[in-house]
A protein has these predicted regions:
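Specific aromatic-rich, kink-prone transmembrane helix
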Residues: 39-42, 62, 81-100, 116-117
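Loop-to-helix entry region of an early transmembrane alpha helix in multi-pass inner-membrane enzymes
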Residues: 5-9, 18-35, 72, 76
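Short acidic/glycine- and proline-prone juxtamembrane loop motifs at membrane-interface regions
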Residues: 68-82
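Membrane-interface alpha helices of multi-pass inner-membrane proteins
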Residues: 108-124, 160-161
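Short helix- or helix-capping micro-motifs
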Residues: 56-67, 91, 117, 121, ...
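Transmembrane-lumen/periplasm boundary regions of multi-pass, lipid-linked membrane glycan transferases
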Residues: 119, 130-227
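Membrane-interface transmembrane helices that cradle and orient dolichyl/undecaprenyl
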Residues: 45-53, 89-109, 217-226
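Transmembrane-helix motifs of polytopic, lipid-linked glycan transferases
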Residues: 27-50, 88, 92
């Protein structure tokens, strides 16, 4: 109950094709990784206006070198589907802003990005951080980058809530157990403040390790390691 159900729903479909538990566990992360790499290559091709095999290979290697992606696409966590959907949503957002004055195509990519984000939110609750960040940026930079009208933003919000109906309905009928777990039980001080701090510290160390290549490359770009 601590995660929305989309990953479980998709995995249940695999049951119709194979009863091999190892296949069931590995097939979805593998397919998701394939989708991400394909989108990455298409994105690279779109920016370069041609298929650059060298740049595409570098992009794939850099992606796989980031521990958090290697971990989540090797183990059957809900995160592999979350990453795939948000990656696809990001690409659609890129296409939305790149379409210039072609209003019809722009709206097509905007709503497709919203739809993919809604599915990501149906995979893990922390997808809301992506959506909140995108919305905050669009509202803050609206005069400079344009973006959807307030009417389309409201329509998109309604669309997101409609897609989350299964989660909302289940929580209403189960005393909001998912939200209670994330907002109360995980931070329950009866477990001890030291335990909460210990878990938070361990989480931060895990984040530093998981994103270590990004931090190192950023430091190098700022000439922190210019003498090494």
């Amino acid at each position: 109950f601590d995660h929305p159900p989309l990953t479980t729903w998709v995995q249940s479909i695999i049951l119709y094709f194979s009863d091999n538990k190892y296949f069931q566990i590995k097939v979805l992360p593998s397919i998701s990784l394939g989708f991400v790499l394909i989108i990455m290559i298409i994105w690279q091709q779109y920016i370069s206006k041609r298929l650059d095999y060298n740049q595409s290979l570098k992009s794939v290697i850099l992606f796989l070198a980031v521990p958090i992606y290697a971990i989540f696409f090797c183990i059957s966590f809900p995160d592999f589907l979350l990453i795939t959907l948000l990656f696809a949503s990001s690409f659609c957002l890129f296409l939305y802003f790149d379409r210039g004055n072609n209003r019809i195509k722009r709206l097509y990519y905007w709503y497709f990005a919203v739809f993919l984000f809604s599915l990501a939110l149906l995979t893990k609750y922390n997808a809301i951080l992506f959506g909140a960040g995108v919305l905050a940026y669009i509202l803050y930079k609206k005069k400079d980058i344009g973006g959807p009208s307030y009417g389309h933003i409201i329509a998109s919000t309604i669309m997101i809530f409609i897609i989350q109906t299964p989660v909302l309905f289940w929580n209403v009928n189960n005393d909001f157990v998912s939200f209670s777990f994330h907002l109360n039980e995980r931070l329950d001080q009866s477990n001890g403040v030291l335990l909460i701090l210990k878990n938070a510290f361990g989480f931060l160390l895990g984040v530093l390790f998981a994103f270590s290549p990004i931090f190192i490359l950023n430091l190098r770009s700022n000439n922190f390691f210019k003498n090494y």
